């Protein structure tokens, strides 16, 4: 298994950040445009909740569309939420989205634990 960690400082209060990142309708806004991200199970709720299923299509490689389904497995208001892949390209995908107050704004951390397909050949 592998892990990626990203963090960024956002110069606004934690409430603004939480309200933005916990609204699944904003996923397209925060996904790089080259991915061709499109939610396919609309209409979708305005706030993420544990048990929420989000189905979407992306075109990450050679413009080949790929279906992906994630479940929001944990939500702690104003702190974090976790999405886990249910259908998609990885053997395992566990993505934590964490926020915390810091001086001058909010620290947002993404922690992605994943296992590529095809064992050692999928690296």
Outline where the language-model segments fall.
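Hydrophobic ligand-binding cavity/cleft-lining segments
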Residues: 1-49
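Short, surface-exposed coil-to-beta transition loops
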Residues: 3-5, 65-69, 91-96
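Generic structural detector for well-ordered beta-strands
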Residues: 5-11, 38, 57, 71, ...
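Phosphate-binding glycine-rich loops and adjacent basic patches that engage nucleotide phosphates
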Residues: 14-15, 31-35, 56-62, 97-109
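Hydrophobic pocket/interface hotspot
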Residues: 16-21, 27, 54-56, 72, ...
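Glycine-rich portal/gate segments that line the openings of hydrophobic small-molecule binding cavities
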Residues: 39-87, 104
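Beta-strand/loop substructures that line and gate deep hydrophobic ligand-binding cavities in soluble
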Residues: 85-123
């Amino acid at each position: 298994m592998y892990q990626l960690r990203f963090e960024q400082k956002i110069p606004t209060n934690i409430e603004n950040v939480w309200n933005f990142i916990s609204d699944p309708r904003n996923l397209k806004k925060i996904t790089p445009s080259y991915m061709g991200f499109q939610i396919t199970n609309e209409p979708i709720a305005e706030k993420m909740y544990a048990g929420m299923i989000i189905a979407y299509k992306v075109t990450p490689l050679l413009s080949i569309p790929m279906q992906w389904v994630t479940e929001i497995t944990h939500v702690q208001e104003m702190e974090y939420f976790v999405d886990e892949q249910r259908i998609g390209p990885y053997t395992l995908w566990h993505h934590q989205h964490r926020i915390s107050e810091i001086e001058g704004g909010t620290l947002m951390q993404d922690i992605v634990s994943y296992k590529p397909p095809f064992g050692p050949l999928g690296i």
